[in-house]
From Swiss-Prot:
<dbReference type="Pfam" id="PF02704">
    <property type="entry name" value="GASA"/>
</dbReference>
<comment type="similarity">
    <text>Belongs to the GASA family.</text>
</comment>
<dbReference type="InterPro" id="IPR003854">
    <property type="entry name" value="GASA"/>
</dbReference>
<keyword id="KW-0020">Allergen</keyword>
<protein>
    <recommendedName>
        <fullName>Cypmaclein</fullName>
    </recommendedName>
</protein>
Length: 63
């Protein structure tokens, strides 16, 4: 099933301080992984693809 990335990322980023940036990266990760972890942080074991995407510096790409 296709997930609603906008809706899932709005939920995921609802408590983020850098809300726009959170939404941008969550959106990229959601498009690639078709999964956004539950809650507003953590729970990344539910979405291994989301958890394992790295940015250019080797850190976590997905919020």
């Amino acid at each position: 099933a296709q997930i609603d990335c906008d809706k899932e990322c709005n939920r995921r980023c609802s408590k983020a301080s850098a809300h726009d940036r959170c939404l941008k990266y969550c959106g990229i990760c959601c498009e690639k992984c078709h999964c956004v972890p539950p809650g507003t942080a953590g729970n990344e074991d539910v979405c291994p693809c989301y958890a394992n995407l790295k940015n250019s510096k080797g850190g976590h790409k997905c919020p």
